[in-house]
Amino acid sequence: MKTPITEAIASADTQGRFLSNTELQAVDGRRAAASMEAARAQKLIDGATSAVYSKFPYTTSTPGNQYASDARGKRDVGHYLRKANHGLSGQAANEANTYIDYAINALS
């Protein structure tokens, strides 16, 4: 997979040199941006999970594999949120309603 980081490393490697300070700073900047993006995504998942659990409180109080009484429930809410987000962002616009309906039906 080609990314700006891998291309910079490949370019420096073919030229037989180390990465320049500018290239290293760009790599660090991209890593920092990726870390911030991941933190924002986790906050969004936490908020969505809280909203689902407050609307459907029985999902956390009833034990069993089909309820969100453990970390798997939070993981699943994050999964459905990503699917809905991908659909709404235009990557698969016609699938957005399908995933949202599926998530709602799964929680009903």
Swiss-Prot record:
Domain of life of the native organism: Bacteria
SUPFAM superfamilies in UniProt: Globin-like
Xref: Gene3D superfamilies: Phycocyanins
Keywords associated with the record: Antenna complex, Bile pigment, Chromophore, Electron transport, Membrane, Photosynthesis, Phycobilisome, Thylakoid, Transport
Main location, first listed in the record: membrane
GO cellular component terms listed in the entry, alphabetical order: phycobilisome; plasma membrane-derived thylakoid membrane
GO biological process: photosynthesis
InterPro entries reported for this sequence: Globin-like_sf, Phycobilisome_asu/bsu, Phycobilisome_asu/bsu_sf
Protein location: Cellular thylakoid membrane
PTM statement from Swiss-Prot or TrEMBL: Two isomers exist.
UniProt topology in membrane: Peripheral membrane protein
Function, in words: Light-harvesting photosynthetic bile pigment-protein from the phycobiliprotein complex.
Subunit structure: Heterodimer of an alpha and a beta subunit.
Family: Belongs to the phycobiliprotein family.
Name the UniProt record assigns to this protein: C-phycocyanin alpha subunit
Gene label: cpcA
